[in-house]
């Protein structure tokens, strides 16, 4: 916020001469001046709140991107199921984040581990937080839950989605965001009392670790405990591709996520009307400029990762694959999210280039270990997110670090930028801590769901598809009466379970023209 302007009648009076009305004139001028100053202050709050709300809307729109990406990446027989789980992530996550999540994350005053106030938004808004901030943070929380849903797609019971989504957004994710983003967190770069990890905290500006690693590691445990989908690996252990049914939806979802990322990364500044030191660059330069730079670094990282994936996969598999390119693009975005505000544009290109190789490498490792993740979510968000945190410890620029995190003139910065290895050490600790925390919380949860037979659907249901067996029908309309139609198209075969006794679910297959 801009500093308030002040006016004193006692200071102004000597400048008005010795007229009889000088005192009254000074008081009148100062009263008008105070009114204008208050108006400007209110305008600043309004502009900053509007900026934050707009960013929240962009981040929330990423849920549509996740939904389209997930729908296109699964087989047609599970489309309705995965779409419903994405709606559930937002709805259940909103309720749990309102009751507990926001309080655990930002309920100040608190200790370094967990927040203690604002349960159910009680005593809200406060001087520190407004409702717009809650909305923005909720959008981040459900993004983490959406990442996890992709890892366990096509084989997970609906009740398991409800349980894990509420637990992740209401407890697991908020604790991590408290550690690294709250003003009281033990590793937060925004903490002011100096009682920090290595005395300066970690830099995870928009959440390569807080959001992407949390969602990715949670998905890793879910997919690992469930096991691969039926048919994903043959009897000899070789990988069998279970292609998603719509590359068009994958591309649509990717572009929606790309658009939303401009609220995710630049929006994490929270305010836009903030001046920087004018002696360095002049009055034209302020937080609005840093926001623009953040959008540029985000763009370059994603574009570089997409192009790198395109040509690398062409060399590896001898064809151009749009789905691989989309995943590479998103991997670049996940990686740059940590350091987007504190690195140069050229460094973002380095980030995206290596992120593409990280994703390719983790995908190869997953296939070798017979790990099945339909959306590559654990590899993309967990793997590339981890690289993004390390990248920040290598390439964070001193000037930008001091702009984004003022008040600590001797704060360490990137190793390759001359800042030594302290920040890199803190970033490595963040990676280890997030992996540990999510593993000891989400791992046991998925294991308990598995033991109580609440995690994976039956083999027959999985073979037939959950749209038919769990959700009352297909996501796409099948017109049996059009079977003999001369309309151009291709035939799809509907397969239903063989062990049901109802007349409507007897074993049959119907060829339908689409």
Curated annotation (Swiss-Prot):
One of its GO terms (cellular component) is plasma membrane. PROSITE patterns: AMMONIUM_TRANSP. The chain crosses the membrane at residues 52-72, 87-107, 133-153, 158-178, 205-225, 249-269, 290-312, 316-336, 342-362, 375-395, 428-448. Keywords: Ammonia transport, Membrane, Transmembrane, Transmembrane helix, Transport. GO terms for biological process: ammonium homeostasis; ammonium transmembrane transport. Induction: By ammonium supply or colonization by nitrogen-fixing bacteria in roots. Down-regulated by glutamine supply in roots. Highest expression after onset of light. InterPro entries: Ammonium/urea_transptr, Ammonium_transpt, Ammonium_transpt_CS, NH4_transpt_AmtB-like_dom. Its main location: membrane. It is a multi-pass membrane protein. GO terms for molecular function: ammonium channel activity. Belongs to the ammonia transporter channel (TC 1.A.11.2) family. Ammonium transporter probably involved in ammonium uptake from the soil. This is Ammonium transporter 1 member 2. The gene is AMT1-2.
């Amino acid at each position: 916020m801009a500093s308030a302007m002040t006016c004193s009648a006692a200071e102004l009076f000597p400048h008005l001469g010795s007229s009889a009305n000088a005192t009254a004139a000074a008081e009148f001028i100062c009263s008008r001046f105070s009114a204008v100053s208050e108006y400007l202050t209110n305008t600043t709050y309004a502009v900053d709140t509007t900026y934050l709300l707009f960013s929240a809307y962009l981040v929330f729109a990423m849920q549509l991107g996740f939904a389209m990406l997930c729908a296109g990446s699964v087989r047609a027989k599970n489309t309705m199921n995965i779409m419903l789980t994405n709606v559930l992530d937002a709805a259940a996550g909103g309720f749990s984040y309102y009751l507990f999540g926001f309080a655990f994350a930002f309920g100040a005053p608190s200790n370094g581990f967990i927040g203690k106030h604002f349960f159910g938004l009680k005593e809200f808004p406060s001087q520190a937080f407004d409702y717009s901030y809650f909305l923005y943070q909720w959008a981040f929380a459900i993004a983490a839950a959406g990442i996890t849903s992709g890892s366990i797609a096509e084989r997970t019971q609906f009740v398991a989605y409800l349980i894990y989504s509420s637990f992740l957004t209401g407890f697991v994710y908020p604790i991590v965001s408290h550690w690294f983003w709250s003003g009281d967190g033990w590793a937060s770069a925004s903490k002011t009392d100096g009682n920090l990890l290595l005395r300066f905290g970690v830099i995870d500006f928009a959440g390569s670790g807080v959001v992407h690693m949390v969602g990715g590691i949670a998905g890793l445990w879910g997919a690992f405990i469930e096991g691969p989908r039926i048919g994903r690996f043959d009897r000899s252990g070789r990988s069998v591709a279970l292609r998603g049914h719509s590359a068009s939806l994958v591309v649509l979802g990717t572009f929606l996520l790309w658009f939303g990322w401009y609220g995710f990364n630049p929006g994490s500044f929270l305010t836009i009307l903030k001046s920087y030191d004018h002696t360095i660059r002049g009055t034209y330069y302020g937080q609005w400029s840093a926001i623009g730079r953040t959008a540029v670094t985000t763009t370059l990282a994603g574009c570089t990762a997409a192009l790198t994936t395109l040509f690398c996969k062409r060399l590896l598999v001898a064809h151009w694959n749009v789905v691989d390119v989309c995943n590479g693009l998103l991997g670049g975005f996940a990686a740059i999210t940590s350091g987007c505000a504190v690195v140069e544009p050229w460094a973002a290109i380095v980030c995206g280039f290596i992120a593409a190789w990280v994703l390719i490498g983790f995908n190869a490792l997953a296939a070798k270990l017979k790990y099945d993740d339909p959306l590559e979510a654990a590899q993309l968000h967990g793997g590339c997110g981890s690289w993004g945190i390390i990248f920040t410890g290598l390439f964070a620029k001193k000037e930008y670090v001091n702009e984004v995190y003022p008040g600590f003139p001797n704060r360490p910065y990137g190793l390759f930028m001359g800042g030594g290895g302290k920040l890199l050490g803190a970033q490595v600790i963040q990676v280890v801590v997030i992996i540990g925390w999510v593993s000891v919380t989400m791992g046991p949860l998925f294991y308990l769901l598995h033991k109580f037979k609440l995690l994976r659907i039956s083999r027959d249901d999985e073979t037939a598809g959950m749209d038919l067996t769990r959700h009352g029908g297909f996501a796409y309309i099948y017109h049996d009466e059009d079977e003999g139609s001369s309309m151009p198209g291709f035939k799809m075969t509907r397969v239903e379970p063989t062990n049901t006794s109802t007349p409507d679910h007897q074993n049959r297959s119907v060829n339908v023209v689409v």
